[in-house]
Structures are given as C-alpha cells and as structure tokens.
Amino acid sequence: MNVSTPGFQRCATENEMIGRTAFLFQSNVYTNNIIAIITWTLTVVVLRKLYTKSIFPNSTLVLLVASLAVGSIHEFLYGFIQNWSLLRSLVYWDQPCKIMFNEYECYPFYTANIFIRLLMICTNCAITIDRLITLSNVGIKSTAQRGIVLFILSILVSVGVCMYMTSDGPNDNLQSNCFQRQGRNIDELTTQIMIYLYIIAICLSLNTIGWFISWRNLKKDKFNLAVQMSKQESINSSLVVTWYLVSQIIFLGLYSILIYAVIKLKDVIGPLLVTNVVLWCYTYTYACMFLPIIILTSTKIISLQRREKINGLTKENQNENQKSYFDKLDRSWSQGYGNRYAPNVPAPVVCINSS
C-alpha cells in the first residue's frame, strides 16, 4: 500500500490548470467519443450478421461475441473516465482546488480499466486456444460450452493479474483524470506495457502455427467433402483471428513505442503537454474499433469464397448432368436408330427334302 506523500498539494498548479483546460485534451475526448460511437454501431451490425449467418464454429462464435462485448465495455468505461474529466475541467475551469482528481476517488475506475484491458488480451488468447483445440483434432466438436468455459478462464486470469498489478493501492497524489496515475515509476509502466505485448505476441505465434497446420492438412483427403469443409472452416476462423491479433499487435505496439518516445522526449515536449500527449498515444480505442471492422471484412470475404465454391460445384454438377443426359440420349438414339432403320434382310429359307 502506498503511503501518503508529505506536504502533497490538493490544488492544481498553474501548468496543470493549463493542461486541464487545453484544447489538446478536449479534442482528444471528442475524438474518442466518435470512435466509441462507431465501435458500438459496427458491433450491432456484426452481431446481427453473426446471428443470421453461420460462418464460425460455435465455440469461436461465443468467444468473438464476448470479445465484441469486452471491446464495447472498454469504450464505455474509457469514455466515462474521460468525459468525467472533461466535465470537471469545464465546470471548474477557474477553480484549481476542484478541477483535479485524487487516487482514492479514481482507484475503482483505474482498476476497472486495467482489468478490461487484460480481459481484451486474455479473450484473444482464449480464441487462439480454441482454434488450437480444433486444429489438433478436427473430429472434436466445437460447442458453445467450450467457448463459455474458455471465456470464464480468461476472466479469472484477468482478475488475478489485475489484482497483482494494482496491489499497491491508491495514494494521495493528484491526477488530471482517472485513466493514468501520476508519479508512477517509469520502469513499472514499461514492464506493464511489455507484458501486454508478450502475451499477444505468443497468441499470434500460436495462431499462425495453427493456421499453417490447418492449411497443410487441407491438402490431404481432397475427395472427402465433409473433412474438407471442416478443415476449411478451421482455416477461415484461424485467419480471422490472425488478422485481429495482427491489428492488436500493431495498435498496442504503436502505443508502447509512442509512450517510450514520450518518456525519452518529456523534457522536449514540456510539462504542459506531456499528460495530454499520453492520452493521444492511447490506441486501445482504435483496437476495439477494428475488431468489428475485421469481422465484417473477413465474413464478407468468406461469404464470397463460399459463393464462388458453390457456383463452381453447381456449374460442375450441371455440366456433369448435361453430359450424362446427352450420353444417355445418344445411346438411346443409337439404339432406336438401329432398331428402326436396320436393313430388311429376308430370313433364309430352309428347304427340307423328304425322301
């Protein structure tokens, strides 16, 4: 538990007042509000599509829906934290002793934000594990119960890691918002970010290996349609998860790089801008927005591929039926022609001489 800082200030400094009322901060909140609205709208569209079209296995479907829900909750929680900060900055723009937050009032929201971020990552890992289970044995049936169990496990892991990361508790420091804690050790923050990246990188590697295995297995049993369809379904699901995890690594990696750059250039950026620049470096909101976009795009691609395969099979079947029909017609015509127009040769007359 952190101890109180002797002589801590309960009122904002002049620099903090400038940062709290800056356009750089306000525009960031407005931008993230727009991103949240887009995320929620696309999530509704995706959920309706997933409900009406059978594209993913049951377990993967449960986990994808859970991932969409977690992303939407993250957008709501982060939006609440930032809009609360914006409201206070607008109402108390000229009252330095009321415009700031303390860690005791922010601690529940700060902890919840860390938990939801961990749950985002752990849910992705659960999807990867689900894919590996299916790819290890195509005969294993994908059930909704398995998806629910994996999601519950991801919740338990997120709770445990979150409790470890926030075990020091709140202190008496002032904060400009309930998203970031001021006065934290830089090495601790860097380690936290790297843990996120390590977990996602491992999940991406495992999913890539699984996708390669399923692609290789698809080359076998080409004449077993049921096995081919099951394997193709596994490839489609793995490919969607891979695309999603790649986007997560891009955004979270970018967040880590930007935070590292801010730490190194904090003296150049200046105390007036550092806090608000960090807000613009937060890319989790973009990661949440890209999940429904990736699912929409991938389902569209999968649907087009299915349609092409169906059209190809239908055309092949039609050609086969037409060929069979004309072959049969040809045989029938030949037989009919032979019977009808066979030369009329008189039967030989056999004479029997009687003696």
Swiss-Prot record:
Any one Gene Ontology cellular component term annotated for this protein: membrane
Main location as per UniProt: membrane
Alphabetized UniProt keyword annotations: Membrane, Transmembrane, Transmembrane helix
Location in or out of the cell: Membrane
A molecular function GO annotation: olfactory receptor activity
Topology in membrane: Multi-pass membrane protein
Any one Gene Ontology BP term: detection of chemical stimulus involved in sensory perception
Protein family: Belongs to the nematode receptor-like protein sra family.
Name this protein carries in UniProt: Serpentine receptor class alpha-34
Organism classification: Eukaryota, Metazoa, Ecdysozoa, Nematoda, Chromadorea
